[in-house]
Amino acid sequence: MALSLTAINLPPPPLRDNLLSSQFQFRPNLLKFPKIPSSSSSFNGISLKTVTPNNNNNNPFACHVSTSQFGVQETNKSYAEAVAVGKHIRMSADKARRVIDTIRGRPYEETLMILELMPYRACETILKIVFSAGANASNNLGLSKSSLVISKAEVNEGRTMKRTRPRAQGRANRILKRTCHITITVKGLPAESVVEASSS
């Protein structure tokens, strides 16, 4: 028994774009945001800015940018630096860097509290250097300790003392006694400026 097959020509299915009417088609335009000029302070790289919407402009993304009073005062102030250096400290540079990286950029009083609580042997030595830097700033430059900030904290490798340890069968192992140099720089305002700012 033979079967006869007939080909049926069906129209192609309509495209998806044709199903939607022109009133429902939406092609968003690229949004252009306004450029906001910003400036940073020479002391800590942070400026306080206030952004408020601009109701007078038809652009919904337009806004007013104004620098706060603290940011303006901070830019105009002149800061002085005091340095304390500890050389040939019997400690590897890597062990000192993990503490130095924690206190860099922090206020002086907060740094003292952190060093007293951290459970590392390097904290005791670094605490003495920070105390020395604070004393140099207060006594030599007349800076207020409440305004001091750890602006720079560096650790460099020092001289390495080589020793030997006797081992079995006439051999010897090398012992490396490493040292490092620690530099702490604090930056702050004179005591007179702090008193004038607090009184005003």
Curated annotation (Swiss-Prot):
Chief location of this protein within or outside the cell: plastid
Domain of life according to the entry: Eukaryota
Gene3D superfamilies: Ribosomal protein L22/L17
Keywords, in A-Z order: Chloroplast, Plastid, Ribonucleoprotein, Ribosomal protein, RNA-binding, rRNA-binding, Transit peptide
Pfam families: Ribosomal_L22
Localisation per UniProt entry: Plastid, Chloroplast
GO-annotated molecular function: rRNA binding; structural constituent of ribosome
SUPFAM superfamilies associated with the record: Ribosomal protein L22 (SSF54843)
GO cellular component, one term: chloroplast
GO annotation terms (biological process): translation
Family: Belongs to the universal ribosomal protein uL22 family.
NCBIfam families the UniProt entry points to: rplV_bact (TIGR01044)
Function per UniProt: This protein binds specifically to 23S rRNA.
Quaternary structure (record): Part of the 50S ribosomal subunit.
Record's miscellaneous remark: In legumes L22 is not encoded in the chloroplast but by a nuclear gene.
HAMAP family named among the record's database cross-references: Ribosomal_uL22_B (MF_01331_B)
Name assigned to this protein: Large ribosomal subunit protein uL22c
Protein species of origin: Medicago sativa (Alfalfa)
Gene transcribed to yield this protein: rpl22
